């Protein structure tokens, strides 16, 4: 009730002042008074009050600045004079101001909540208005319709001006590609005083097949690579390519003395029969020695203290030269290599051979060179007990060193396993 009385008192005072003003009305004084009040209200008006004015319901006559400006511009085009220069009666101005202030005070509480949204909308409206004004300022519309249809839609000068201006962070595709070539992106020069890093180069690693292929290109050499082989070796149809293999014909020629000149007066050969004793006693090559365990190989081939310049040839074989003979030959070569680890490729026994297809083939071709001239197979039924005994004896090396030192059995020098069979290659 108190607020209503206050508003009625204010309206009565305004009516009285308006009545007094009508008696002594002077158009020039009213205009000056209106301009002064307008400047004063613009100075004292806060952004909050201005926003509250914008949010007054549509029934009032107060409009937003953009709408008012557009109406003024339209009115200026229609009437010929802008509305800002037209004089407004003082009474209507004062009445509008009073009613506006009363309505503003009444809607203050409801308008505070929408301040933030109005502020953001106002910023967008102002940006759009500035863009429209800039486009209208630069746009020159032709008067003739024919020129409008045949001319360019956009002038190049406007495009250049817009490109020179700093745009927003968003990128857009230009429909007018520039003729200037794009500058290549150059990396910054590195400092010349930087220390040089050492490059680690990978060493060439050759497998066994490559090494054997390389050795195959060279002439047949003995184990220490110092001399060519005395006996001709087989190149094809052999089982053990890492071992020098000779045929039964070559061994027969060696026994018959055809290679004595190459061996020299103090040289010689020796045949190692790796079969079991009952096989050896049943028939063997003339002059052969029976060695079937690794311990016997170690005793028969000790380490030499001095270099032997005389050539000595050793031919290994068993019944078929498939297992026992090649194993003992490789064992001898392995021990020999281990004794000369720091003096490669020196060897005490460099010239070792394996007989192709063993005693069985040699006996079938040259039985006259065998004594006694007989052939007892390993699996002969009459020697089953002996076979089991010697077989177990030669396999005892797999269970450890000690005892009898059969194939692989213990001895003064243990067998070191090699990752490559080249260790035994001659």
From Swiss-Prot:
Looking at the record's lineage, which domain of life comes first?
Eukaryota
Q: Which residues form the Rhodanese domain?
A: 265-371
Primary enzyme class: hydrolase
Active site per database record:
318
A GO BP entry is: G2/M transition of mitotic cell cycle
Family according to the record:
Belongs to the MPI phosphatase family.
Cellular component terms (Gene Ontology): cytoplasm; nucleus; spindle
One of its Pfam families is Rhodanese
Regarding tissue, the record states: Expressed in developing male and female germ cells.
Q: What is this protein called?
A: Cdc25-like protein phosphatase twine
Task: Give the organism, scientific name.
Answer: Drosophila melanogaster
GO MF terms listed in the record are: protein tyrosine phosphatase activity
Map out region (Disordered) in residue numbers.
Answer: 1-27
Lineage of producing organism:
Eukaryota, Metazoa, Ecdysozoa, Arthropoda, Hexapoda
